[in-house]
């Protein structure tokens, strides 16, 4: 087994877990019980320059089953294959499902690294608890995922921008109709080799900011990575594309508070009303997904100590006014898939608001963040955020 990766302290669950009366005797998720079955029919490889995100999958997958009476069964790594689910499986009817998005990188030194995997494990744990899926040991799950990555490490393409995208997923599998806690679940992980998101350089996106559509609201599940948050975004996304925009800028409330962009967190670098240079992003108030890239940008920028870094609310009125007054330096989205994504224009209430792009296709800060994160992910800079696993 690979060396254990330690996790930082995490929040205790705030919701009850489905359990039999003999809770203490239920089996916990245990990576030492992991068994590995090697495929005898390797999957077809795709030339890395022809990879389409999320369309190609590696040879193996991880599966961890849970049952209310027994707890967690021994985890397995086996050949990638279809799942067998009953038509009555609760996940198919009530969206009792959550997932993660994380990556493994082949570094400039040919060693394999993850990027802040403890944050992904913590978020998956919190998403699971919020959806009344069973508790699990984050350290043990990370050990299992690490073994899966090592098993399929030959699927990780070399080169900056390339990676193996990891998709841990937790679903309720109980076979009955009725809204309630699932008496069984499946936690699995599949891997997809990914090409460079920007194969020919940055491509700024245009956004549709339409207050008619709301992504999340107080007391909801906007801070979880549940599939229930993504399906309702597809129609507004199609409306944005019909108006020539690539993404939706999600707004909330009567004052059109800015929240997220597409499936990414949002940042704005500007001169605020007090005349200060400030990097600002919406706060984690329960409506915002706590992105790993988001947290990394906040941590890095605060470490530079070159300008003010704030996690606070702001609205489209402030953005529009600042753009018209020339106080916005740049805006960008941040997420696992793209790392950072420059914003070039916002369509809002009949106006086309142009966002500065100092370097032609991105802002200077956007480019700096992208470079610094890549240097960590690919090992050019040794950092605790990028543990070497192989």
Curated annotation (Swiss-Prot):
GO terms for molecular function: branched-chain-amino-acid transaminase activity; L-isoleucine-2-oxoglutarate transaminase activity; L-leucine-2-oxoglutarate transaminase activity; L-valine-2-oxoglutarate transaminase activity. Pfam families: Aminotran_4. It catalyses: L-leucine + 2-oxoglutarate = 4-methyl-2-oxopentanoate + L-glutamate; L-isoleucine + 2-oxoglutarate = (S)-3-methyl-2-oxopentanoate + L-glutamate; L-valine + 2-oxoglutarate = 3-methyl-2-oxobutanoate + L-glutamate. Its cofactor is pyridoxal 5'-phosphate. InterPro entries: Aminotrans_IV (IPR001544), Aminotrans_IV_CS (IPR018300), Aminotransferase-like (IPR036038), B_amino_transII (IPR005786), BCAT-like_C (IPR043132), BCAT-like_N (IPR043131), BCAT_family (IPR033939). Its EC number is 2.6.1.42. Keywords: Amino-acid biosynthesis, Aminotransferase, Branched-chain amino acid biosynthesis, Pyridoxal phosphate, Transferase. GO terms for cellular component: mitochondrion. One of its GO terms (biological process) is L-leucine biosynthetic process. CDD domains: BCAT_beta_family. It comes from the Eukaryota. The modification N6-(pyridoxal phosphate)lysine is found at residue 225. PANTHER family: BRANCHED-CHAIN-AMINO-ACID AMINOTRANSFERASE (PTHR11825:SF44), SUBGROUP IIII AMINOTRANSFERASE (PTHR11825). Belongs to the class-IV pyridoxal-phosphate-dependent aminotransferase family. Catalyzes the first reaction in the catabolism of the essential branched chain amino acids leucine, isoleucine, and valine. Homodimer. This is Branched-chain-amino-acid aminotransferase. It comes from Monosiga brevicollis (Choanoflagellate).
